[in-house]
């Protein structure tokens, strides 16, 4: 190939960019969003739905968009056409767009104009654009032909952190400049003399004690707002800023953010601010906070826009998410807390408990045994009954269902349970169940067919009552169906119950934190030896002594399956069955996804609610399929959405220890609680979900540290994926069979995300996030990739096992199953199951206790992972793969993954490197007539790479690993087969590829920007008949070795040998560079500037011959490139 | 996580406290000197972006040899006084500050100009890289006024997308430009130091404070952006082999046999910008949003919005979100 061809091929082109949203602007009913150098245009309909109309690509080259300015139309007609100035960094471009009738077309774009300095603000002045530049100067620019008309500096030359231009003509142009010294400088560029001598500031305003990041001027009211590093927003009365010498008065100093404030925007009636704390606050002009929008994740909100007519605020975050919020001033209509004025001379006694039957009926009992009903339609209290047997102790629970099934139940301290039909309380039925106190009551409803009431009595006995109604509706029947027995514990009662569809089992939670499974109809378990065993009082030592006699009396059925203490000592608070899973919540601040397989309960995933919500009280499934979490955060009751990370409702109820009830129907959500001797009711019309908050889902809120492609799912034509991103560019036939790459990413935000990247649409869908890590995730490894059903009975889709590891020396193992699902936007369903976890500090604590070691946890981080598998083509052989971890404490550790990842066990370690180990990588070596060999390479901050032979590590009697000094401690890995000093400092990327000659190419990239490539030969010593027993150690040697010292200008964090002739590298200098291999030194072919800063990891894979290769770059964002082979 | 956790994760942070340095950065300058003998023969030095002052501490000890040298330290932030160091509080990119610094060297130029300047990073990478480059260029502009021919200039540099443009700019003024990374600077950090030796401005160059030095742009040379001809200066790792590894987590009992004792920070920050906000937060006095307050049910039904009394002073709540170091 000639030199020129070489220079062009292969050429990487950007397919997809996920970056912080740094520019947002509403134009009519359209939303402009900047993402990297691209402009995204969305249509907003009145419901607040957002539909992407078009991506206008690459407006700013390698700059990122920071803002848009739409040229004002004198005729006010922006509905069919608009001229938009797009700026960011030092770049400016003008683009003309026609967008009538929802069809969007780019009519014209100017050149990309490079300024000499950073652009802080831009403003249209009669067809030209004024720009406020980085060192406090203003230029007037003709954006059509690209020439500078004016260039006026300020006498006070300094760097700015923000600027705001005001006025519509050059003559009246005013700049408010935010200097790094925290001052605001107001000056008038047009007062410059013809020679453009610097202009002196007209006014200096100080007040903030940190730099000013954003400003907004409201001409109609003469107000200026500023947002600062000092975490405050200031409101200034400035009058008409275009008039020199005016008075500036600070009329508001608003502290509400708990971190730096990035953005501020003045509206006619509100002030909007947003910042690093991910909160968007709505203030009155007087400085009161009216609303707070929380939901973005990570490092903050970077852009805000407002649609004043629709009263929407739109925010864009570092998480690349875009959200829409409703401006309603002081709270949502139809939402509020009211006291139901129970106290009255006609209603004696004090309130003891409250419950809700649907969202319209409140029930309450008093300490004189009175049961009262409050109907919100009638708006008055009515006594249903009075029974003095319930005066000293009384439990009250209404039946579930939208109208509470019209039933409630009472229970007292003497084992009495009363079931009351609310409409005909006289038909109430009493049941004397126990000799002692009823500890708890709960209901379980199956469709509208089966209703059970469970009551816990002394000794862990749970009576299960079957409730049915007469066809007339006038009478009810209560029949005891059976009794269950809970596992022994101090506080031995159940707390919640639910039917497991189809209805053969009941799932219960107990006060001890266990989740239990009981047969719903034990009569069906007649056959001996099948199903649960009846436990007798004699067998259950702590069972109630109620029956008095010592003979074997059957007290109840034990659980068929249980997860002991799943939620810890504080207890389980709810169980819910939905979509094939069981969800349990607890006062440990977590909720679990469980499932029942073969009559056994199995945990799938543990999830945490928002910070501070340590008491989760329950879950609700919203009609749109999303879930909300109910719980208590200090004194507040909170409804929280895991999907939008938003606190949907906050009620200051005083905490969860008092009696409370929650109900959610389509019409309204209600929360009732007792406070100051009265019943309080919070109600929100329209249910607990707020519509259309998320315009676009965010990805990770913080830096992405690792990316790994898992595999590809092929969808048949029946799953045709609509191309939203490029509706125009779609050529007929290009829909094809949908190929979707599945990629996982790990982030400093402590989550692992599963992404679907279709090859046809250039979109990314976040399928699921795994939130088990307590610290940042830094490394991922995948093994056992297959299809659902396995090789024998293969179904479309993808299965794999994943290990993730990171800060606090924590490692998790989970399995992934992705199947086609036409009902989701991504056309995929993703199921995750958590398999196991490991924490080094816990392990050390155990060993310290056992061996009196004095090893103190040095807060180790895992930096990199590699699956080491000898026979990946023959899974199931041997004890399971190993996973090697590079550790910051200087160790390389080997873990054994047994039982498909259900057991994670620390096997061996070595402190050979004595430095922070940055990378591990493994490969196998094959040679004719020889056993396949498994080689691990590890590389550290001193630039050395060590090679280890792990072939026989798992063999019985192998000497690869030296036994530990104490049993239970890890084995020692001995000395490496070879070490190579590849670099003078840290190795940030490492890859190998077998060569046709039977050797291996090893490539590494370093912190100093250098590349190192060498050929490694693996030789086995001749087998000597005499000592066939002794282990053979391969001899590794370096054949030819090359260094490229200044390959990149920063850390080389990604390297991949694509073929023995071609290599690609990626660096923090934002270059993706191709290198030709094979004739001596690697030679530069070409490089592409990409947009993601701080790239920490790269993965490349071939898709298919037509599509070529794909490459994912992960850093402060994610970008996907592709190139043809 | 306890207070020792940062000591475990960052050995240089811990050593700095134990050795009385105001910041761990002191080791960076010491390791740079180990490699380049920066302080040899230096009598007058400028420390730009000096707060909290660990580089000034190092300079005041090492500069001047027997006779006392002169160190001028400049920072935006207030800095606790140091014996023998002249302090200027101001923005080094501001004309007036630059003039004030230059005054001190009229007639007697400096031998060494160092700048460890870093903006308070915003997390938007392009902004941060730009702001950092402006500090370097402002420092370079000051250096062109105060540095004697053959003098040395050391400045922090972020190795991002456009770093090669800065290298080519520095090469105009110095006979040797290297990129150095002390071992005490982490692998995971994009910071490095441009070590520029042999100040030798182009013939006919007239320093001009009033016009800021602008970074070059790629416009003139496509090869600088995509091609192989970028100016990537040689890279040097500094610090001897036995130096601690700043990326490694060490257990509290280091191998040198010394027993660990917790040391509080040498010099806490003086009046950081977030001080007032933290104080308010601590006292639960940050403004809180409107929460539906109590009112009777009839009012709820009659009014489209419930009435509320807004409280500006919220009750004390647990503070677990932001770590106020004040
Ligand atoms: C990394 S610290 C320097 C630490 C210092 N070398 C030491 O050893 O203690 C960076 C300093 O740059 C300062 N800085 C940032 N922008 C500045 C500016 N425009 N003018 C002056 N100082 C600035 C900050 O206030 C901060 O103190």
Curated annotation (Swiss-Prot), chain A:
Family per record: Belongs to the WD repeat WDR6 family.
InterPro entries reported in the protein's UniProt record: Quinoprotein_ADH-like_sf, tRNA_Anticodon_Mtase-Reg, WD40/YVTN_repeat-like_dom_sf, WD40_repeat_dom_sf, WD40_rpt
Primary localisation category: cytoplasm
Compartments where located: Cytoplasm
GO CC annotations on file: COP9 signalosome; cytoplasm; protein-containing complex
GO molecular function annotations of the record: enzyme regulator activity; insulin receptor substrate binding; tRNA binding
Source lineage: Eukaryota, Metazoa, Chordata, Craniata, Vertebrata
PANTHER family (UniProt xref): WD REPEAT PROTEIN (PTHR14344), WD REPEAT-CONTAINING PROTEIN 6 (PTHR14344:SF3)
GO BP terms in the entry: G1 to G0 transition; insulin receptor signaling pathway; insulin-like growth factor receptor signaling pathway; negative regulation of autophagy; negative regulation of cell population proliferation; tRNA methylation; wobble position ribose methylation
SMART domains xref list: WD40
Function according to Swiss-Prot or TrEMBL: Together with methyltransferase FTSJ1, methylates the 2'-O-ribose of nucleotides at position 34 of the tRNA anticodon loop of substrate tRNAs. Required for the correct positioning of the substrate tRNA for methylation. Required to suppress amino acid starvation-induced autophagy. Enhances the STK11/LKB1-induced cell growth suppression activity.
Protein's UniProt name: tRNA (34-2'-O)-methyltransferase regulator WDR6
WD repeats: 89-130, 155-197, 207-246, 256-294, 295-335, 346-384, 433-475, 489-528, 567-605, 611-650, 652-692, 725-765, 767-798, 860-905, 912-958, 982-1024, 1047-1085
Tissue-by-tissue expression: Expressed in hypothalamus, hippocampus, cerebrum cortex and cerebellum.
Pfam families: WD40 (PF00400)
Induction of synthesis: Down-regulated by caloric restriction. Up-regulated by insulin and IGF1.
Keywords on record: Acetylation, Cell cycle, Cytoplasm, Repeat, tRNA processing, WD repeat
Self-association state and partner proteins as the record states: Interacts with FTSJ1; the interaction is direct, and required for 2'-O-methylation of position 34 in substrate tRNAs. Interacts with IRS4. Interacts with STK11/LKB1.
